[in-house]
Amino acid sequence: MVSMRDLLECGVHFGHQTRRWNPKMKKFIFGERKGIYVIDLQKTLRYFRYTYNIVRDAAAEGKTILFVGTKKQAGGALKEYAEKCGMPYVNHRWLGGMMTNFGTIRQSIRKLEVIEKMEEDGSIKLLTKKEALMLTRKKEKLLAYLGGIRYMKTQPDMIFVIDTVKEKIAVQEANRLRIPVVAPLDTNCDPDLVTYPIPGNDDAIRSVQLFCQEMAEAINEGKALREQDGEALPNEEKEITDEEKKEVLDESMSEEDFGEEQE
């Protein structure tokens, strides 16, 4: 579990410039130094350890925790640690409705499965070069946007977010659906939007890595507690039909997009 030394070495205590802050974060601020707010690491440590246990217990109950972080310095670490603990993730961009309109998202994931099946059974080789190219492009796009959640069959039980300001749409959707939000809170964040806040820097690469690493560790610890009672879920994959293949091909040729890009 995280230590005070870990927090200091990773720069978790460095907040934003004093002109860029949310007054609601005042209770988590230790002071100010050279125009930068310094976060109270005693509180960070306390909240971190409490939240670690919450996440561990959720994983022990078999719950799904979705990792969300699309900014450059977060994407790589977020994907790495989500995969290490076997949880879904979004690190490219958040499509509007990923949780509130999950049925439509599942339909898009199905299209990805259809294209992969066409590659597997060789039916894509029967198409023209242009048709095959358009399908390949669509597959790449679907993988970038939805690859991290392709095995998520239902809405998540909890989300872990890096930068709640940037990922405001994801946080809004979670709040609307009453899905608990776990997140580091920098000095420009609104703590009222987060169920389990951890005051800390959400910009520095080492700080982001530490948060992702600890959440993955908590999840793996919870999964280990569950192993003795765990049962494999039945494989309920639906057979892909020729009609589905045709629909995906027609859509690819019309270059139809999906979802709305978060600003």
From Swiss-Prot:
Q: Which InterPro entries match?
A: Ribosomal_uS2, Ribosomal_uS2_bac/mit/plastid, Ribosomal_uS2_CS, Ribosomal_uS2_flav_dom_sf
Pfam families xref list: Ribosomal_S2 (PF00318)
Give the record's keywords alphabetically: Ribonucleoprotein, Ribosomal protein
In what ranges is there compositional bias, type Basic and acidic residues? 223-249
**Where is composition skewed (Acidic residues) in this entry?**
250-263
The ranges of region (Disordered) come to 222-263
Which BP terms in the Gene Ontology apply to this protein?
translation
Q: What is this protein called?
A: Small ribosomal subunit protein uS2
What gene does this protein come from? rpsB
